[in-house]
UniProtKB/Swiss-Prot annotation:
Xref: Gene3D superfamilies: Immunoglobulins
Every MSP domain range: 14-130
Signal sequence annotation: none
InterPro entries named in the record: Ig-like_fold (IPR013783), MSP_dom (IPR000535), PapD-like_sf (IPR008962)
Protein name: Uncharacterized protein ZC262.1
Pfam family, one: Motile_Sperm
Length: 131
């Protein structure tokens, strides 16, 4: 198997269902920070821990960046774009990586310090200009 095929298979195994296929920021001329709300749903019968990473910590913030989703529960995540230098953001292919692993009773921070990722899904970021 090629590395690309393995990566695609790994992306398919993702337990959490999210509310969007991309993270869309509606940029304004006033350069105020923009937030997008995403929802993660756990359709399984076990508690799952998630971790969200972004391509640039300088222009994005994720709240909360890690946590737990109980069985059949939905959690909200807010992703912020600083909206300071729109040209730099648009010129790069930014994305958010959502990782998950099974919970084992530790806190989320302890769990992600050395846990093996069981699934990942990447959502691309897009920037729309509102005039």
């Amino acid at each position: 198997m090629t590395v690309k095929l393995l990566f695609q298979l790994f992306q398919l195994y993702f337990l959490l269902i999210y509310s969007s296929l991309e993270v869309e920021f509606k940029c304004t001329e006033d350069r105020k920070p923009i937030s997008v709300n995403l929802k993660l749903h756990n359709p399984t019968a076990v508690t799952v821990s998630y971790k969200v990473r972004c391509t640039s910590a300088d222009i994005f913030r994720v709240q909360p960046p890690l946590g737990f989703v109980k069985p059949s529960e939905t959690v909200s995540i807010v992703i912020w774009y600083q909206n300071q230098d729109k040209k730099d953001a648009i010129s790069k292919n930014h994305y958010f990586a959502f990782y998950h692993t099974n919970s084992d009773g530790r806190t989320a921070r302890e769990l992600w310090a050395n846990s093996k990722v069981e699934g990942v899904r990447r959502l691309p970021a897009s920037f729309l200009s509102t005039k």
